[in-house]
Design a protein with these regions (language model features):
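Active-site residues of response regulator receiver
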Residues: 53
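Alpha4 helix (beta4-alpha4-beta5 surface) of REC/receiver domains from two-component response regulators
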Residues: 63, 83-101, 106-110
Length: 118
């Protein structure tokens, strides 16, 4: 059975890039364009890992992370953002990993594989 990853990012290009790249790695990928949509998707689906942007309109990624950890305590969340300074914020420490967005997705793919193989 394929692992299911939920990609949450307000930028459509990023969502589609991650979907394509992660499907090539053999994952099933669901998409959400906002924090609100992500929480709805988690209620509806069996997701194995969440790839979550921080800076989004509405509910930001740090708040989404907090809500995920309240309801789905063991669900791994990887924060993936263009802003490295958020790594120092206490609210991000509940994530399993913090990746700075890059056009080279090797680090991201390796971290996802590592987390799902635990």
């Amino acid at each position: 059975m394929k692992n299911r990853i939920l990609v949450v990012d307000d930028e459509e290009g990023i969502r589609l890039l991650y979907k394509e790249e992660l499907e090539e790695e053999g994952y099933e990928v669901a998409l959400a364009s906002s924090g609100e949509a992500a929480l709805e998707r988690l209620d509806e689906s069996n997701i194995d890992l969440v790839l979550l942007d921080i800076k989004m309109p509405g509910i930001d990624g740090v708040e989404v992370l907090r809500r995920i950890k309240e309801r789905w305590k063991t669900l791994p969340v990887v924060l993936c953002t263009a802003y490295p300074h958020y790594k120092q914020e206490f609210g991000t420490w509940a994530s399993e990993a913090y990746i700075v967005k890059s056009s080279d997705l090797r680090e991201l793919k390796e971290k996802i594989r590592e987390i799902l193989n635990r």
